[in-house]
Design a protein with these regions (language model features):
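Short histidine-centered beta-strand/loop micro-motifs
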Residues: 69-75, 116-118
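Charged, helix-prone or intrinsically disordered regulatory segments positioned adjacent to compact structured domains
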Residues: 11, 21-45
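Hydrophobic micro-packing sites on short alpha-helices
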Residues: 1-9, 13-17
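A short glycine-rich, His/Asp/Glu-containing loop-to-beta-strand
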Residues: 34-71, 128-133
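Ligand-binding loop in jelly-roll beta-barrel domains
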Residues: 42, 100-101, 109-134
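Short acidic-glycine-tyrosine-enriched beta hairpin
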Residues: 47, 93-109
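Short, conserved beta-strand element in jelly-roll/cupin
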Residues: 62-63, 73-90
Length: 134
């Protein structure tokens, strides 16, 4: 049968009949979507377009001095970040953690959480969530 032949070839019906599409691997600045929040003093750059349809969603977050992200409610998943510039405070539930340039953070978002920059300098971080939540 066709299924037996496809198994011998190391594929299946879905893969065999799927239309091939060119998957974009490299994304340039022109591909990014940028949103500036003047109230919270932050800028979010979605560095992978349409990442909401993927398993994880990376962003480049720039916080002005004293800037913050919005308060996020508890949800399933994982969150990871790497501080490129400055120093941040990660607020998870009632605890506050500090990370500075060259340091990273990771947590499961089972509590309300948000990030702030210190009042004297801003910060820039790569922040990745799974599943997508930005």
């Amino acid at each position: 049968t066709l299924i037996d032949i496809l198994q011998c070839l190391g594929t299946n019906l879905t893969e065999f009949f799927a239309e091939e599409s060119d998957e974009q691997i490299v994304f340039r600045k022109d591909d990014f979507f940028v949103k500036k929040d003047t109230e919270l003093h932050n800028t979010i750059e979605w560095i992978i377009p349409n990442a909401q349809k993927n398993m994880m969603e990376p962003i480049l977050l720039t916080l002005e001095s004293g800037g913050s992200t919005y308060l996020d409610v508890p949800h399933e998943g994982e969150e990871f970040g790497y501080v490129l510039q400055g120093s941040i405070q990660i607020h998870v539930g009632k605890k506050v953690y500090t990370a500075k340039k060259g340091e990273s953070f990771y947590f499961t978002p089972h509590s309300e959480h948000y990030i702030t920059a210190n009042k004297t300098s801003g910060a820039k971080i790569i922040w990745v969530t799974t599943p997508p939540s930005f």
